[in-house]
Amino acid sequence: MNTIVSIEHLEKVYTARKLFDDTACYIGEGEKLALIGVNGTGKSTLLRILAGEESPDGGELIVRKGLQIRFLSQNPKFCEDETALAACLRMAGGEVSGEDTTAAAKKLLAALGVTEPDLACETLSGGEKKRIALAGVLLHPADLLILDEPTNH
């Protein structure tokens, strides 16, 4: 197995409560992994740590050098006055200008059921917003795709 992520003895504590302790996991190239558990067990926290958006309190996280990681958070942030297309492009990050990127974003949004990319986000449902965020994450290639509750709406 060609390991792209190695987690050893990972710890996270919130206000004197250990969320997880001595957690270990190895993710190989091409593997799929699902975290399943009850609320409050640290699944989202572990994913934020993997994505580099939060730091562990102990242990070791080794990510293969140059690994392209794309992360869809559980609660993506929206600017209510922006359009679905603008939100998708903003969430895509990186180089998002140009006709090719805009066309690809529109195609991806349509494939995910967002058929009116010029509507303001404030008029959209939670599920539509989640699909817009997913399109933004999928717009650029990634070696590791981290999706935190991508279908919870």
Place the predicted regions along the sequence by residue.
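Conserved beta1/A-loop at the N-terminus of ABC ATPase nucleotide-binding domains
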Residues: 5-15, 61
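Conserved structural motif at the start of ABC-family nucleotide-binding domains
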Residues: 5, 20-22
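The feature captures the beta-strand-to-loop junction immediately N-terminal to the Walker
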Residues: 23, 36-38
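ABC-family P-loop ATPase nucleotide-binding domains
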Residues: 2-3, 9, 67, 73-136, ...
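Conserved hydrophobic segment flanking the Walker A/P-loop of ABC-type ATPase nucleotide-binding domains
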Residues: 27-29, 63
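Helix-to-loop junction immediately C-terminal to a conserved catalytic motif
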Residues: 51
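Short hydrophobic beta-strand immediately N-terminal to the Walker A/P-loop
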Residues: 33-35, 47
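Catalytic Walker B motif of ABC-type/P-loop ATPase nucleotide-binding domains
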Residues: 145-149
